[in-house]
Amino acid sequence: MGLHSELKLAVPWGHIALKVWGSQKNPPVLCLHGWLDNANSFDRLIPLLPQDFCYMAMDFGGHGLSSHYNPGLPYYQQNFVSEVRRVATAFKWNQFTLLGHSFGGCVGGTFACMFPEMVDKLILLDSTPFFLDSNEMENILTYRRRNIEHTLQVEASQKKSLRAVSPEEMLQGFLNNNSHLDKDCGELILQRGTTKVDAGLVLNRDRRISWPENSFDFVSKEMFVHSAKSLQASVLMIKALQGYYDVRRANDADKAPMHFMVDTLRSTLKERFQFVEVPGNHYIHMNKPQVVAGVVGPFLQGLQRMTSARL
């Protein structure tokens, strides 16, 4: 399944860009990338998955090849959840599978709770908890304020042209900010995340998008427990042992929120929940796609039933 096609889905602010592998007559699997990534992050994984599905990897608004939001409209997690619904409506999907990495898992998980009848399987690849870490309680208003101020600051400077840099400088800067990616994976994401101009490369992403905690729809633990009860999907959660455990990297050493999430899903979904730990870092699906495919493939086909495992 090495070949793919490109689609553009019209939306009120422009278009959502998608990469498609396989026949659209097959059961759909919608793939959601992580924060500031794009659909290319699934290029290494999808060719290794069962070929009797149609895989669509979308670029969230303001990412990759998708349109930026209209001026004045900030980026919040709820907006991305709405984009998933737009894609499902456009392709007339009554039910489909969601596969999300990192922040994409949070978006997919939120969608599966809001529209439980539409999601038959939910796959979370090193996704962070959907709820508010108690350590962040005093910071939540700061994040909201920071998002507004950042948006206003970017809008005030929009008349300035984007700074173009050489491909080498672009890659090095990207890798400096993404220590879990190697050179090849970094180049793969930048292929879709940059545009070539006379002076070099410029980033495609909307500069209004800042740190994920500024746009994350934090909910309480109580709300998360309540939302989990609405899930109708079978859920596979793959945790990279050297991956991320919190939306904010500063809290990564505290694994209690992740354990709470796993325990809640396990006690709520029972046999519909599978938890698998794999060796690797946050970009395990890019760095070691064969490891992830070995877990995701059987789950998609309903061939493997496990409640907990470590590979």
UniProtKB/Swiss-Prot annotation:
Record keyword Cytoplasm present: yes
GO CC annotation: cytoplasmic vesicle; mitochondrion; perinuclear region of cytoplasm; peroxisome
Primary location: cytoplasm
Pfam families: Abhydrolase_1 (PF00561)
Gene (UniProt): Serhl
Induction: Induced by passive stretch of skeletal muscle.
GO MF terms held by the record: hydrolase activity
Parts forming coiled coils: none
Protein source organism: Mus musculus
Entry keyword set: Cytoplasm, Hydrolase, Peroxisome, Phosphoprotein
Domain AB hydrolase-1: 27-227
Family, per entry: Belongs to the AB hydrolase superfamily.
EC number: 3.1.-.-
Protein name (Swiss-Prot/TrEMBL): Serine hydrolase-like protein
Tissue: Ubiquitous. High protein expression in skeletal and cardiac muscle.
Modified residues annotated as Phosphoserine in this record: S210
Enzyme class: hydrolase
Catalytic residues identified in the record: S102
Record's function text: Probable serine hydrolase. May be related to cell muscle hypertrophy.
Alphabetized InterPro entries for the sequence: AB_hydrolase_1 (IPR000073), AB_hydrolase_fold (IPR029058), AB_hydrolase_sf (IPR050266)
Cysteines engaged in disulfide bonds, as pairs: none
Subcellular location: Cytoplasm, Perinuclear region; Peroxisome
